[in-house]
Swiss-Prot record:
It comes from the Eukaryota. Induces contraction of smooth muscle in isolated rat urinary bladder with an EC(50) value of 2.2nM. Belongs to the frog skin active peptide (FSAP) family. Residues 25-46 form a propeptide. Its main location: secreted. This is Sauvatide. It holds the Pfam family FSAP_sig_propep. GO terms for cellular component: extracellular region. Residues 1-24 form the signal peptide. Expressed by the skin glands. The gene is sauvatide.
């Protein structure tokens, strides 16, 4: 009976550890996805603002 308790405890412990690793990897993937979305948004803003910046810098160079 004692062996069954220990083995059950070991199985549950290993299951929890593997779940925590999976959650950690999922969080990293989500963070990477969020970073790539932020980079896309920044790139879109730069695209919109680039013509205005170029016009201002050309005007100051005259």
């Amino acid at each position: 009976m004692d062996i069954l308790k220990k083995s059950l405890f070991l199985i549950l412990f290993l299951g929890l550890v593997s779940i925590s690793f999976c959650d950690g990897e999922k969080r990293q993937d989500d963070d990477e996805a969020n970073e790539s979305e932020e980079k896309k948004e920044i790139h879109e803003v730069e695209k919109r603002l680039r013509p205005a910046i170029l016009v201002r810098t050309k005007g100051k160079g005259k």
